[in-house]
Amino acid sequence: MKAFPPERIVCLKEETVETLYLLGEQDRIVGVSGYAVRPKQVRKEKPRVSAFTSADIPKILALSPDLVLAFSDLQAEIASSLIQAGVTVMTYNQRDIAGIMAMIQHLGATVGQEQHALKLVN
């Protein structure tokens, strides 16, 4: 990862967008999935760089992300392309409540908001 905690994050799945906003870390987000709708202002504030299983790789690279957050094997090709381009990619596979809670805690720790993330999941 270029910076820790990461300063420039691209979110390819809407759950990570919403979580970063809930953690008060929305200023770290530099690009989002076209499906991101929560919170409402995200569509006005952040550039859209991907659909669910496709992404504009050159647009993502132009944003100079420290970290890209992806989802599961469904975005494996996108993740692979970004990794080959030298980008750090973190992939989550939250498919149930426990997985969602774990993702929130892990993402909170990644951006230095462990305590806030713990409050969200409790």
Predicted feature residues:
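N-terminal ligand-binding lobe of clamshell/alpha-beta domains
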Residues: 1-122
